[in-house]
Amino acid sequence: MKNNNVYILEDRGLLYINGDDSKKFLQNIITNDINKVSESSSCFSALLTPQGKYLYDFIISKHKSGYFLDCEKENIENLCKQLNIYKLRSKVEILNLSNEFVVAALSREKYLNIDGSKDLEGYTSKFRDDTILLDPRNKELGARLIINLEKLYLSLKKLELKTEKIENYYDLSHKLGIVQK
């Protein structure tokens, strides 16, 4: 991945889980420990059926009083429905923010030049109030910037990044053994 390239991951969507019971709700249904997720740490997790069969995977990061779930956009409606089935009487709100936020991938080297970054998988910090994290699956995949669409191009300009074809990102991902599509 070239240092000044950015990949706009248009095939990724974002759910936002918020509410008094959001942490407990997620802890009871995902495959990873939600206690690992904080303002400075994100994790990769999945949702399984009650029989243990794979349904969806996602990257979870803390955002304000809730959690972002970064997942495949084509599955987002089904994931949202599934989460609402498990919701029952939990005090949680599940919002699809895919039309308001976008996920962009940038190189690990560029990420490490940003103030407050650390070379740890899943390390999470802020860039201009937006979440930026080193990919928790493999840090060679670079960092993910979860940013409001309105601020996207201004932030890319500030970081001196130019957009690149998404296929190059997926080629790297496949070489690292992380199949995304």
Where are these regions (language model features)?
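Basic, glycine/lysine-rich polyanion-binding surfaces/domains
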Residues: M1-K181
